[in-house]
């Protein structure tokens, strides 16, 4: 058993660092009610987010239902696992169920199709507490941020990591030099999980751990794109920037887009223009790389863009948040709109028995006019969500409001119907028990499952 799991905190009081965040999640759980928003615990890996969630569940005697990125997180899968868990009580005797969704910022791609939307719907109907875990809070969808409460976990200080490493050494019967523990804590970069793994790799099979044993178990210190962009605007040494460009997982064309998307951090317009000129020159090398399949040119592209932008910034640094490229956000929004439109066409085609092409070409304008006049009726008839309704009325705020109001009305109707069924009957014969009168007129009803547009 690896030491990370073996020595995972069992109670909130055992969690290292981030005392403010730990206090917030405890107060949230202590006074939890359905009116409270779910929490999103976010921060760098190894800062105690998942461990705090499990420790909280243990302290509160809550059962945990977890989904992470290794699961198939389609809309159907989330509703099957988390949806059922969020509305049903625990069978194990626990007072509540804690629905835990790890790596919530990784809801993308084909495997997570509809996952973010499903989470928002599950949150709206949940009767159990929900916690989401994310590394990058800013990559979450706007809808998900609106229905959750963020709690930040910051990187741990080395002096906070050392006592926990010392406890683990004592429990394992390993004598450790203080210098070795300090070295591990400093190398970990605020990541407790990395520190424990480094200690395990260095101390396994030993009775004494010296400072010289640590270098073989150093943490993978690959740079991130955020660090590279920040270092470029701070004007780090040329050699450091080129080394970081090799370490990041992004290709030079992606790095170029990140730099372009953050040129607003330049101190003035002249510096920004100079930065754009460097990126334009680098873009020529990138284009030649793809045309000629000569990837050696990538190093020239990296040098031109990084050193040029760094020189233009003049060490001004980044004052604000480093943002992903805006074109990625626009492409994502366009892709989402196309997916919503395709899904809506398919839904209406199945309900009305009209081919999708005919719907789009001959009926969509007429349907739009009808929906704009009375959106609530068509939300009920066609089971539209906010994104689908927005395609008709082109007002996202109004679409969201209408869908929420309809959902609330339907919920009230369901409650009244359930109460009516439970009420005792007086044995009075209903008119529905009488056979219908034969008027001799034939009726032409829609075929089963067919909806009508007009």
From Swiss-Prot:
One of the GO BP terms on file: DNA replication
InterPro entries membership: AAA+_ATPase, ATPase_AAA_core, P-loop_NTPase, Rep_factor-C_lsu, RFC_lid
DNA-binding recorded as keyword: no
Bias kind Basic and acidic residues: ranges: 408-446
Region (Disordered): 408-454
Domain of life: Archaea
SMART domains linked to this entry: AAA (SM00382)
Keyword ATP-binding: yes
PANTHER family the record matches: CHROMOSOME TRANSMISSION FIDELITY FACTOR 18, REPLICATION FACTOR C SUBUNIT 1
Family: Belongs to the activator 1 small subunits family. RfcL subfamily.
Complex formation: Heteromultimer composed of small subunits (RfcS) and large subunits (RfcL).
Protein name: Replication factor C large subunit
């Amino acid at each position: 058993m690896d030491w990370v799991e073996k020595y995972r905190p069992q109670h909130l009081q055992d969690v290292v660092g981030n005392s403010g965040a730990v206090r917030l999640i405890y107060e949230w759980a202590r006074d939890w009610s359905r009116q409270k928003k779910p929490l999103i615990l976010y921060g760098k890996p190894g800062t105690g987010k998942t461990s705090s969630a499990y420790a909280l569940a243990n302290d509160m005697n809550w059962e945990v239902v977890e989904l992470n990125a290794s699961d198939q997180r389609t809309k159907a899968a989330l509703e099957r696992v988390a949806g059922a868990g969020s509305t049903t009580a625990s069978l194990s005797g626990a007072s509540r169920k804690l629905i835990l969704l790890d790596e919530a910022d990784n809801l993308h791609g084909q495997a997570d199709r509809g996952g973010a939307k499903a989470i928002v719907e599950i949150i709206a109907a949940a009767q159990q507490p929900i916690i989401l875990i994310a590394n990058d809070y800013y990559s979450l969808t706007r809808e998900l941020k609106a229905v959750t409460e963020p709690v930040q976990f910051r990187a741990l200080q080395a002096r906070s990591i050392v006592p926990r490493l010392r406890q683990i050494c004592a429990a394992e019967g390993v004598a450790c030099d203080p210098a070795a523990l300090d070295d591990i804590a400093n190398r970990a970069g605020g990541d407790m999980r990395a520190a424990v793994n480094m200690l395990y790799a260095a101390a396994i099979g030993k009775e004494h751990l010296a400072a010289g044993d640590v270098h073989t178990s150093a943490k993978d210190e690959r740079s991130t794109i955020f660090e590279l962009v920040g270092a470029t605007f701070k004007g780090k040494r040329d050699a450091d920037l080129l080394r970081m460009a090799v370490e990041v997982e992004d290709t030079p064309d992606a790095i170029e887009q990140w730099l372009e998307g953050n040129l607003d951090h330049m101190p003035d317009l002249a510096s920004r223009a100079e930065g754009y000129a460097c990126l334009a020159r680098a873009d020529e090398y990138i284009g030649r790389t793809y045309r000629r399949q000569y990837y050696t040119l990538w190093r020239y592209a990296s040098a031109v863009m990084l050193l040029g932008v760094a020189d233009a910034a003049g060490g001004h640094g980044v004052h604000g948040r480093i943002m992903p490229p805006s074109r990625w956000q626009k492409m994502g929004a366009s892709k989402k709109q196309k997916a919503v439109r395709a899904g809506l066409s398919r839904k209406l085609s199945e309900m009305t028995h009209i081919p999708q092409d005919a719907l789009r070409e001959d009926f969509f304008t007429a349907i739009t006019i009808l929906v704009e006049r009375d959106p609530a009726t068509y939300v009920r008839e066609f089971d539209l969500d906010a994104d689908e309704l927005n395609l008709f009325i082109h007002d996202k705020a109004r679409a969201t409001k209408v869908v929420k109001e309809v959902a609330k009305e339907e919920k009230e109707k369901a409650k009244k119907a359930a109460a009516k069924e439970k009420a005792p009957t007086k044995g009075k014969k209903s008119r529905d028990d009488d056979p219908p009168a034969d008027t001799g007129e034939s009726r032409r009803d829609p075929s089963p499952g067919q909806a009508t547009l007009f």
